[in-house]
Amino acid sequence: MALLNRRWTGCVLGVAMFVGWTAAISADAVHNDGHEFDFEFGTWKTHVSMLKQPLTGSKTWAEYDGITIVHKVWNGQANLVDLDMKNASSHLKLASFRLFNPATHQWSLYVANSHSGTLGVPSIGGFADGRGVFYDKETFDGKLVTVRFVITPRSADAIHFEQAFSADDGKTWETNWIADDTRVKDR
């Protein structure tokens, strides 16, 4: 089970093998300016639901609670996310480094976890119509899958995240990661 958790957290947010796949959101379709994540800076209470066995038909989820801290870097042109979450049987730490590319007007989201100690390849995309959508390709359980990661701000104090895998190049999707963040207000 520990090996499964290490392997799963290593790929859960798009951290496995990138296969030169271009994001579905092109630079022409989305004109980001490098401040799309400004709404997220600060500390958040996080609840995560993670599908235990993606792409198997399983409906068994693991639930985690934790804290996310989002730090501004380079005046907002980058940011660092520190997620620390646990449940009764597992403790997971993830870090995400998000970089804005001014030439393409897209963001690259790199993720690492404390179990593997490695930085994965990026999910690439941007924000349009009030939500961020990011894509990559990676290998999961020996199969090449398309990964979609969606960030939806619901208010100034609430954000919803979803990750889904597609084993058929985006025809169908299975959501395998759901996170809801609530801002921790200064006292």
Regions found by a protein language model. Name each.
Residues L4, F18, I25-S26:
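Short stretches within intrinsically disordered, low-complexity N-terminal or propeptide regions
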